[in-house]
Curated annotation (Swiss-Prot):
One of the record's GO cellular component terms: cytosol
Annotated metabolic or biological route of this protein: Sulfur metabolism; glutathione biosynthesis; glutathione from L-cysteine and L-glutamate: step 1/2
Protein name: Glutamate--cysteine ligase
Keyword Transmembrane helix: no
Any one GO BP annotation for this protein: glutathione biosynthetic process
Keyword ATP-binding tagged: yes
Gene name in the database record: gshA
Alphabetized NCBIfam families for the sequence: glu_cys_ligase (TIGR01434)
Pfam families associated with the record: Glu_cys_ligase (PF04262)
One Gene Ontology term of the molecular function aspect: ATP binding
InterPro entries: Gln_synth/guanido_kin_cat_dom, Glu_cys_ligase, Glut_cys_ligase
Superkingdom classification of source: Bacteria
Family: Belongs to the glutamate--cysteine ligase type 1 family. Type 1 subfamily.
Organism for this UniProt entry: Photobacterium profundum (strain SS9)
Keyword set, alphabetical order: ATP-binding, Glutathione biosynthesis, Ligase, Nucleotide-binding
Amino acid sequence: MAFMDFSQRLQQISANSDALTQLGRGLEREALRITSEGNLSEQPHPVGLGSALTNKWVTTDYAESLLEFITPVSQDVDHLLTQLSDIHQFTYRQMGDERLWPMSMPCFVGKENDITLAQYGSSNTGRMKTLYREGLKHRYGSVMQVISGVHFNFSFPESFWQELFGDQSEQDRQDSISDAYFGLIRNYYRFGWLIPYLFGASPALCGSFLNKHNSSVDFKQLGCGTYYLPNATALRLSDLGYTSNAQSSLKIGFNSLDQYLDGLNQAIRTPSDDYADIGVKVEGEYRQLNSNVLQIENELYAPIRPKRVAKDGEKPSEALGRAGVEYIEVRSLDVNPFSPIGITEDQVRFLDLFLTWAVLTPSDDMDDSELACWRDNWNRVVLDGRNPDLMLKIGCNGERLSLQDWGVRVFKELQDVAVVMDKAAGNNKYQETCERLKGWVLNPDLTLSAQLLEKVKQNEGIGSVGHQLAAEHSQTLAERSYGFYSQPEFDVEAKISVEKQQKIEQGDTVSFEQFLDDYFADLK
């Protein structure tokens, strides 16, 4: 694979239509529950949704009010989006007059302590999940933790790897796949700024959010409580959003699975003086799981992650170490405020194209300084991406290229991928998506952030826009009928999830303290 260029690799996989029609995709969408007045819900997790610990479709993220909707893996884009829509419809039917906040950045958030941590019952596993969130609260504050996004899980089928690598032993295949996914990840850091440019939807913030952060950014003010940057795309991905200064010193590389796991394992074992000052157990009450830089692996902030489905009791890094990378998780998508389900078909198809292009495009190793240069491009795009004169770095050698020129170059090759994918599927959907979004590169006013900022300006603030969109989406979903699942299926899953939680609680045989000692035994 190493000696072939992009077009040769594309030609190679185009020989097998299954290689590009059997892509695996899964979606996770986060959304805050709000009252009909637009305030953060203080109600517990709706009973009709079952157990947040064990329901396979609906859970909670950081807060009791922060829902997370999870689809299974699908090879069909329409099925994927219909499943996500059905899960939303079911959820709305359990929420009374509450609604879902339609944006990534929270609004109308009062004090930190107004945000109730997600509750998962009395089992050791459930208590550990809540305690982890308690640690996040002490470390970063609750307001940052209720920023929401959409995560896109993505994998290539065996037929794809067969076309690229031919016959291999099981171990060689596993290593080749992991190496290819890490090549994709490096290219994602190089070129993935296209995602916040096109789909970033957090150009403005509520003052209630900004008040909790000391910012040196020169915001413009709108009305009495909205702050924005004229050309911003995704403030969620900036230092104001979900990032961690404490993690900036971590050196986690993406040149190989071994390098990545070494960095991750070091991070969960590295003590932090700042976090030690918080205390782990104070006056008999736990404040965090431990005082290391990362309490657990999931605390690592990253715009993309290599993943493998873990077995029971297995940590994410152990799963990767056992059998290599199985799929990747894209974490840079803002919630699309104009979609009732937070994402559209065009966005999914673009990600299909972009991630396929990223794995087929040669990807040299990347040291820490080069990674820092690429991260700087991301920061420029999230703060100033719609500036028509914006220049981005090409690596660390001082060369620069305009975002627009670079975007057009990438789209030229994405178009080649689209032709091959459409031929395999027997339609023109990928080419149509590609053509539409290329227009967004040429005209920043078409991007999601531009559309949203225009609406915010017209309505004199982000709060009223969010409230209006939440009401519209609620109505839209209420008028839809299920397209994939059924009400009985959802009801059964909710009932079974409660039974599963009870079984877990009844199955505990050790104290919570012993449970934590056992879980972190390998860190000692």
